[in-house]
Amino acid sequence: MPSFDVVSEANMIEVKNAVEQSNKEISTRFDFKGSDARVEQKERELTLYADDDFKLGQVKDVLIGKMAKRNVDVRFLDYGKIEKIGGDKVKQVVTIKKGVSGDLAKKVVRIVKDSKIKVQASIQGDAVRVSGAKRDDLQSTIALLRKEVTDTPLDFNNFRD
């Protein structure tokens, strides 16, 4: 019986590349000359450092631009509070979301069941498994979910025939 998994996970290799490119651009830009602006990554957590709120916004814009170029959906980013650190410097912690939350999983299952497509959806941890008799039904389910769920980036993987 063909099936696939609905997951929500950022490509961490591309995130790392985007962070490195952002740091490279920040180090060469004229408006950041002499400032301590940078982006650091620890696992699924990014920390943005800058001299003031305005420069922090610019660092954020550079990071978002680099992520968009590397096809990393910026809806994965969850921005924390802006914190003041020593003097005028500020930092902001950005976490990268992973997994389909319980509410989103229930929403996906409800959309699949209400669609009257002959497939079954079941929640399995931080993913939703969709299985059906025909491959065409699964492909129409993928199209339906891409159209209906716009607030969270969804990936479809583990396609089994």
UniProtKB/Swiss-Prot annotation:
Keyword Chaperone applies: no
User: Could you tell me the keywords of this UniProt record?
Assistant: Nucleotide-binding
Pfam families in alphabetical order: DUF520 (PF04461)
| Gene Ontology terms: cellular component | cytosol
Per its UniProt record, what Gene3D superfamilies does this chain match? 3.30.70.860, YajQ-like, domain 2
Q: Which InterPro entries does this entry report, sorted A to Z?
A: DUF520 (IPR007551), UPF0234-like_C (IPR035571), UPF0234_N (IPR035570), YajQ-like_sf (IPR036183)
Q: Which SUPFAM superfamilies match?
A: YajQ-like
Q: Does the keyword Transcription apply?
A: no
**Could you cite one Gene Ontology molecular function of this protein?**
nucleotide binding
Which function does this protein serve?
A: Nucleotide-binding protein.
Name the family the entry cites.
Answer: Belongs to the YajQ family.
Protein name, entry field: Nucleotide-binding protein BMA0373
